Curated annotation (Swiss-Prot):
Function: Small GTPase-like component of the intraflagellar transport (IFT) complex B.
Modified residue annotations for Phosphoserine: 137
Pfam families registered for this protein in UniProt: Roc
Recorded name of the encoding gene: Ift22
Transmembrane segment boundaries: none
Name of this protein: Intraflagellar transport protein 22 homolog
Gene3D superfamilies xrefs: P-loop containing nucleotide triphosphate hydrolases
Organism: Mus musculus
Amino acid sequence: MLKAKILFVGPCESGKTVLANFLTESSDITEYNPTQGVRILEFENPHVTSNNKGTGCEFELWDCGGDSKFESCWPALMKDAHGVVIVFNADIPSHLKEIEMWYSCFVQQQFLQDSHCMLVAHHKPGSGGERGSLALSPPLNKLKLVHSNLEEDPEEVRVEFIKYLKSIINSMSESRDREEMLIIT
Protein backbone atom coordinates (compact mmCIF):
# COMPACT_ATOMS: atom_id res chain seq x y z
CA MET A 1 0.00 0.00 0.00
CA LEU A 2 1.36 3.40 -0.96
CA LYS A 3 1.56 6.09 1.70
CA ALA A 4 1.92 9.74 0.67
CA LYS A 5 2.94 12.68 2.81
CA ILE A 6 1.31 15.98 1.83
CA LEU A 7 2.21 19.30 3.48
CA PHE A 8 -0.33 22.10 3.97
CA VAL A 9 1.69 25.31 4.32
CA GLY A 10 1.06 29.02 4.01
CA PRO A 11 0.72 32.27 5.92
CA CYS A 12 -0.96 32.55 9.32
CA GLU A 13 -4.76 32.72 9.30
CA SER A 14 -5.08 31.54 5.72
CA GLY A 15 -7.46 28.67 6.51
CA LYS A 16 -5.10 25.67 6.35
CA THR A 17 -6.62 23.87 9.36
CA VAL A 18 -10.24 24.44 8.32
CA LEU A 19 -9.44 23.20 4.81
CA ALA A 20 -7.46 20.21 6.12
CA ASN A 21 -10.34 19.20 8.39
CA PHE A 22 -12.84 19.53 5.54
CA LEU A 23 -10.76 17.54 3.03
CA THR A 24 -10.00 14.74 5.49
CA GLU A 25 -13.54 14.78 6.89
CA SER A 26 -12.18 15.47 10.37
CA SER A 27 -13.91 17.48 13.07
CA ASP A 28 -14.85 21.11 12.53
CA ILE A 29 -13.12 23.83 14.49
CA THR A 30 -15.33 26.83 15.15
CA GLU A 31 -12.89 29.23 16.77
CA TYR A 32 -9.45 30.22 15.54
CA ASN A 33 -6.46 28.71 17.32
CA PRO A 34 -3.12 29.04 15.52
CA THR A 35 -1.53 25.67 14.75
CA GLN A 36 1.52 25.19 16.95
CA GLY A 37 4.22 23.52 14.85
CA VAL A 38 2.37 20.79 12.98
CA ARG A 39 -0.77 18.68 13.18
CA ILE A 40 -0.77 15.36 11.32
CA LEU A 41 -4.01 13.95 9.92
CA GLU A 42 -3.98 10.38 8.60
CA PHE A 43 -6.68 9.36 6.16
CA GLU A 44 -7.60 7.17 3.22
CA ASN A 45 -9.61 8.26 0.22
CA PRO A 46 -11.69 5.59 -1.53
CA HIS A 47 -11.51 7.57 -4.80
CA VAL A 48 -7.70 7.31 -4.96
CA THR A 49 -6.03 4.01 -5.81
CA SER A 50 -2.60 3.07 -7.09
CA ASN A 51 -2.40 3.06 -10.92
CA ASN A 52 -5.77 1.39 -11.49
CA LYS A 53 -4.56 -1.71 -9.61
CA GLY A 54 -7.20 -1.13 -6.99
CA THR A 55 -4.56 -0.95 -4.27
CA GLY A 56 -5.63 1.42 -1.53
CA CYS A 57 -3.56 4.42 -0.53
CA GLU A 58 -2.92 6.10 2.79
CA PHE A 59 -2.19 9.76 3.24
CA GLU A 60 -0.60 11.87 5.91
CA LEU A 61 -1.68 15.48 5.70
CA TRP A 62 0.74 17.65 7.66
CA ASP A 63 -1.08 20.86 8.65
CA CYS A 64 1.89 23.16 9.31
CA GLY A 65 1.69 26.27 11.48
CA GLY A 66 2.22 29.43 9.45
CA ASP A 67 4.16 31.38 12.07
CA SER A 68 7.81 32.04 11.16
CA LYS A 69 8.81 31.09 14.73
CA PHE A 70 8.49 27.46 13.56
CA GLU A 71 10.94 27.98 10.68
CA SER A 72 13.64 25.97 12.49
CA CYS A 73 11.29 22.94 12.31
CA TRP A 74 10.66 23.23 8.56
CA PRO A 75 13.50 20.95 7.41
CA ALA A 76 12.08 18.12 9.55
CA LEU A 77 8.57 18.75 8.20
CA MET A 78 9.80 18.69 4.59
CA LYS A 79 11.64 15.38 4.94
CA ASP A 80 10.13 12.74 2.63
CA ALA A 81 7.21 14.96 1.56
CA HIS A 82 5.57 13.91 -1.70
CA GLY A 83 3.51 17.05 -2.24
CA VAL A 84 2.91 20.58 -1.01
CA VAL A 85 -0.36 22.50 -0.91
CA ILE A 86 0.16 26.23 -0.35
CA VAL A 87 -2.96 27.77 1.19
CA PHE A 88 -3.42 31.53 1.32
CA ASN A 89 -6.20 34.02 1.94
CA ALA A 90 -6.79 35.72 -1.41
CA ASP A 91 -8.42 38.66 0.40
CA ILE A 92 -5.17 39.62 2.17
CA PRO A 93 -2.79 41.31 -0.31
CA SER A 94 0.36 40.49 1.72
CA HIS A 95 -0.37 36.76 1.34
CA LEU A 96 0.33 36.97 -2.41
CA LYS A 97 3.88 38.06 -1.63
CA GLU A 98 4.30 35.58 1.25
CA ILE A 99 3.41 32.55 -0.84
CA GLU A 100 6.53 33.18 -2.95
CA MET A 101 8.62 32.44 0.17
CA TRP A 102 6.58 29.29 0.94
CA TYR A 103 7.06 28.09 -2.64
CA SER A 104 10.79 28.77 -2.54
CA CYS A 105 11.32 26.96 0.79
CA PHE A 106 8.97 24.02 0.41
CA VAL A 107 9.00 23.33 -3.34
CA GLN A 108 12.07 24.80 -5.07
CA GLN A 109 14.63 24.11 -2.33
CA GLN A 110 13.29 20.55 -1.93
CA PHE A 111 13.49 19.95 -5.70
CA LEU A 112 9.81 18.97 -5.81
CA GLN A 113 8.21 19.06 -9.24
CA ASP A 114 5.73 21.87 -9.79
CA SER A 115 3.11 19.23 -10.57
CA HIS A 116 3.42 18.12 -6.93
CA CYS A 117 2.43 21.59 -5.72
CA MET A 118 -1.02 23.13 -5.64
CA LEU A 119 -2.08 26.65 -4.65
CA VAL A 120 -5.37 27.12 -2.83
CA ALA A 121 -6.84 30.64 -2.68
CA HIS A 122 -9.05 30.13 0.37
CA HIS A 123 -11.98 32.49 0.79
CA LYS A 124 -13.25 32.73 4.35
CA PRO A 125 -17.00 32.82 5.12
CA GLY A 126 -18.48 36.24 4.46
CA SER A 127 -15.48 37.43 2.44
CA GLY A 128 -17.47 37.55 -0.77
CA GLY A 129 -15.07 35.08 -2.34
CA GLU A 130 -13.99 37.26 -5.27
CA ARG A 131 -12.77 34.73 -7.83
CA GLY A 132 -11.13 37.10 -10.26
CA SER A 133 -7.74 36.22 -11.67
CA LEU A 134 -4.94 36.74 -9.20
CA ALA A 135 -1.76 38.50 -10.25
CA LEU A 136 0.67 35.70 -9.45
CA SER A 137 4.30 36.24 -10.32
CA PRO A 138 6.40 33.62 -12.11
CA PRO A 139 6.90 30.77 -11.28
CA LEU A 140 3.71 30.74 -9.17
CA ASN A 141 1.58 31.51 -12.23
CA LYS A 142 2.50 28.08 -13.65
CA LEU A 143 1.09 26.18 -10.66
CA LYS A 144 -2.37 24.67 -10.35
CA LEU A 145 -4.57 27.28 -8.62
CA VAL A 146 -7.84 26.33 -6.96
CA HIS A 147 -10.28 28.75 -5.34
CA SER A 148 -11.82 27.42 -2.15
CA ASN A 149 -15.07 28.67 -0.67
CA LEU A 150 -16.48 26.13 1.76
CA GLU A 151 -19.73 28.08 2.15
CA GLU A 152 -20.66 28.51 -1.50
CA ASP A 153 -19.05 25.58 -3.35
CA PRO A 154 -17.35 23.11 -1.00
CA GLU A 155 -17.26 20.24 -3.49
CA GLU A 156 -15.13 22.09 -6.04
CA VAL A 157 -12.08 22.10 -3.78
CA ARG A 158 -12.72 18.47 -2.74
CA VAL A 159 -12.83 17.34 -6.41
CA GLU A 160 -9.62 19.24 -7.22
CA PHE A 161 -7.89 17.84 -4.12
CA ILE A 162 -8.80 14.28 -5.15
CA LYS A 163 -7.33 14.94 -8.63
CA TYR A 164 -4.19 16.26 -6.95
CA LEU A 165 -3.92 13.18 -4.68
CA LYS A 166 -4.35 10.91 -7.72
CA SER A 167 -1.51 12.67 -9.55
CA ILE A 168 0.78 12.28 -6.51
CA ILE A 169 -0.06 8.57 -6.15
CA ASN A 170 0.39 7.94 -9.90
CA SER A 171 3.81 9.60 -9.77
CA MET A 172 4.80 7.53 -6.71
CA SER A 173 3.55 4.34 -8.35
CA GLU A 174 5.44 5.03 -11.60
CA SER A 175 8.60 5.76 -9.62
CA ARG A 176 8.24 2.51 -7.67
CA ASP A 177 7.63 0.57 -10.92
CA ARG A 178 10.81 2.07 -12.44
CA GLU A 179 12.81 1.09 -9.35
CA GLU A 180 11.44 -2.47 -9.52
CA MET A 181 12.37 -2.72 -13.22
CA LEU A 182 15.92 -1.58 -12.45
CA ILE A 183 16.22 -4.35 -9.88
CA ILE A 184 14.91 -6.95 -12.33
CA THR A 185 17.20 -5.92 -15.23
